[in-house]
Amino acid sequence: MTNPAYFPQLSQLDVSGEMESTYEDIRLTLRVPWVAFGCRVLATFPGYLPLAWRRSAEALITRYAEQAADELRERSLLNIGPLPNLKERLYAAGFDDGEIEKVRRVLYAFNYGNPKYLLLITALSESMQMRPVGGAEVSSELRASIPKGHPKGMDPLLPLVDATKASTEVQGLLKRVADLHYHHGPASDFQALANWPKVLQIVTDEVLAPVARTEQYDAKSRELVTRARELVRGLPGSAGVQRSELMSMLTPNELAGLTGVLFMYQRFIADITISIIHITECLDGAEAASKSPFPI
């Protein structure tokens, strides 16, 4: 594909067979309404994502993993100000309470799921580097599984705007928010917010532009990656696939590419976790932004 907005991936609407089953199980196990951009890119490497997910699912559905995600979420607040009042800004732009509630539901779904994807991608990346992941001794309570399936009040599948088919205006917004983060493409979160172009424009220019890639932001992103690495070592089960096992499955070029993708998305999802929590803080305050919207 020659469209510059495209980055190789398998859309959650265009998969079938084993990959479709893998995507569905990721959503149900993590209790989230989307398959992360990173996972959609990992799906382009032959056989990798279904295998890696099978090796990881049991550890990621534990109460330990849920509490680890809660900790990462709480750590993601930037604690800087003054903050713009996003609710008042949306009112001024013509949004009513019902429309703002729809935006809120999307933000809360991503706030819940982003720290979980940070754990998953970190576990996959650490395992690829043949560093220790999982197998820790934890209490039976933390080893126990949480309910599988989407929590009450969560939409089962969020519609993501396809940047390659969007209007020129929306393509420009998606590129701007990606460039603001120094990213190679827009996160799923912003593809979902692109269903309301004015919302995406406001959060990009008025909420994120003042903070993205500042010293505080970059320090917080490093903190999240560091803590996620520590947390995946404590998982009660194994996760990911080591490079040595993949050498018989992938070509050297594929193996190198996979290593780079995992490294890149570990940092990508840390950034996005911070950004979406910051947007939510500007909408509903720090406590609402940093606590799980779907507690177990």
Swiss-Prot record:
EC number, UniProt record: 3.8.1.10
InterPro entries: 2-haloacid_dehalogenase_DehI
Gene Ontology MF terms: (R)-2-haloacid dehalogenase activity; (S)-2-haloacid dehalogenase activity; 2-haloacid dehalogenase (configuration-inverting) activity
Catalytic reaction equation(s): an (S)-2-haloacid + H2O = a (2R)-2-hydroxycarboxylate + a halide anion + H(+); an (R)-2-haloacid + H2O = a (2S)-2-hydroxycarboxylate + a halide anion + H(+)
Pfam families: DehI (PF10778)
Protein's UniProt keywords contain Electron transport: no
Top class in the EC scheme: hydrolase
Key words of the record: Hydrolase, Plasmid
Family stated for the protein in its record: Belongs to the HAD-like hydrolase superfamily. S-2-haloalkanoic acid dehalogenase family.
Function: Acts on 2-haloalkanoic acids whose carbon chain lengths are five or less.
Protein name (Swiss-Prot/TrEMBL): 2-haloacid dehalogenase, configuration-inverting
